[in-house]
Amino acid sequence: LLWQDNKIVTGFTLADNRLTVRTNGQRGNALVAVYDAGGTILWSWHIWCLPNDRPQDDRYTNRAGEQFLVMDRNLGAIGTDLKTRYGLVYTWGRKDPFTSNEVYNAAGRKDRFINHWPTIYTSNGSEAKTYDLTYMTRHPTTYVYTGWYAKLYTYYDNALWGDPAPVDTCLLYTSP
């Protein structure tokens, strides 16, 4: 068990190359994994439980008259109302979700899901610029980012957006 958001997982069975996850019948999400003898994650699965509340298809029609079916909630959402429809967060190229909510760790204690933002280095000590599928599979709870784009959103600076106004003032904008 890597994390769960509602203590839904009650047990596991690993037999005949098959992982069985038992849940308590409540709504929620979990991320479970299998490891090798050395503790390296071999694969992980997102468990999404929605007893008695299966997602429905909503029909949408675009301006050209084409119809599309869209699930009535985001992947990982436990409901469709304002408080429960958000769901989980996926980053490009990753199969496993991230959550911004508090979760329960493997020890059963409340924890923040993403609790480290590591910089990955290559074997010669330089910062790694690419991450392969093997790394992502073995580190499903590690948020990987590089370069200026990621730092743009994680770096706090009041002048970030280039506002030329002095601190504690604002520019008035008017229409011509």
Name what the model sees in each region.
Residues 2, 116-170:
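Long, low-complexity, polar/charged, intrinsically disordered or flexibly structured peripheral segments
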Residues 40-88:
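GGW-centered surface loops in extracellular recognition modules
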Residues 1-16:
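Low-complexity "stalk/linker" and mucin-like segments enriched in Ser/Thr/Pro/Ala/Gly
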Residues 105:
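Carboxylate/His-rich catalytic cores and anion/metal-binding grooves
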Residues 16-27:
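Extracellular/luminal low-complexity segments enriched in Ser/Thr/Pro
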Residues 173-174:
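Conserved small/polar residues in nucleotide/adenosyl-binding loops
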Residues 28-36:
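A short beta-strand micro-motif common to beta-rich folds, especially ectodomain repeats
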